[in-house]
Amino acid sequence: GYSIKDSSQTKLLDYAASNIQSSYAYSIVPVGDGQMLGIADFLADKDAKLVAYRKVEPGEVREKTVLTYGTLQLDDRVKDAVMQFNQNNTQYEIRFKDYSEEEDPETAFAKDVVSGNVPDILDVTGMSVRQYVEKGLLEDLTPYYDQDEEVNVEDLIPSVAEAMKMDEKYYYVCPAFLISSLVGKEKDVGANIDWDVRQLMQFADQHPSARLFYDTEKKDILNILIAYNISKYVDWKTGECTFDKEEFRGILEFCNRECDSQDGTENEAELLRNGKVLLKPVVVGAEDIEIYRAMYQDDIAFAGYPNEQGRGTYFVFQHQLGMSSQSKNKEGVWEFLRMFMKLDYQGKIQDVNEMNAAAPT
């Protein structure tokens, strides 16, 4: 509140303490007797809601066991889920440890790990999950799945469940996924392509009047090819790196030869339709398939990136959330993690996703 008389300010509402995500709460007005009304538009719901807020004295607030949520990049959807968990759970409350606010986020996180100050909930999205597993940092969630009457591994898409598994165990939950691949016209790449780098270079030779990619720099394709196959070059247990294999030399040759960046002034969709550009690196969800079919104006195929195994289409997991093996409140952590895998949450994923049309797991 603001006083015109003396220009003083008075806190009327504490968003964080009230478990309100300010970016989705608006038009809040006082209606007297310590109450306020406002509109809340949660990501997890399709419709806005009228919400009543009531002032509570500190002594009336029930104490809860605090769970810490550690992340290098805080996502609005997770914030929304945490707020709803805090509102509905009478025993536990989650508080954020956002390492992105630190000058060196990864170093700050590493220091907490070394000192034993590990958050209860770990957001390992895009991180080296296997490395954390081998260090014993993540709890095996398989027993929690097995004992849960509502959330089961059997409910996951089989191929997704297999990709999430490490040494026959599950170390994180993941509510949604995308697909990373190379897309092209089916008549060019074939309906079922398994190729290595040499075969992809031969494919390029068969189309001398076209280029493989529209405007993709060498370093970007190199990064993708290494990132998706990093375990072939790095032994996380010993720290030994092997970059002198024939396959890796082939990758370097491929990137140097086929990935020259263009000026990007030409119309990409037109070049794809006319066969002047053959492939496009994409990260897609289920609804995006029709978009690319319309872009090509033809039947399309997801050919995948080249590798020696011939399986170069990869899952991109959104929100990989794990449990610290050092947590003293593991049951509470599971109460939060399981929320993402329940049917009611899974059923709303495609309705609320603002980026790609991620598919529920």
How would you label these PLM feature ranges?
Residues D6-M36, D41-A48, Y53-V61, H319-T361:
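Mature extracytoplasmic/periplasmic domains
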Residues R257-E335, G347:
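Extracytoplasmic/periplasmic substrate-binding proteins
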Residues M164-E266, S325-E331:
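Helix-loop-helix "hinge/cap" segment bordering the ligand-binding cleft or interdomain interface
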Residues V113-L122, A210, R273-V284:
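Alpha-to-beta junction loops
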Residues M127-S181, R198, D299-P306:
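Hinge/lid segment of periplasmic solute-binding proteins
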Residues V66-V129:
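Early extracytoplasmic/lumenal segment of secretory-pathway proteins
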Residues T142-D155, L212, S231-I251, G304-Y314:
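Short, solvent-exposed loop/beta-turn-alpha elements that line the ligand-binding surface or hinge
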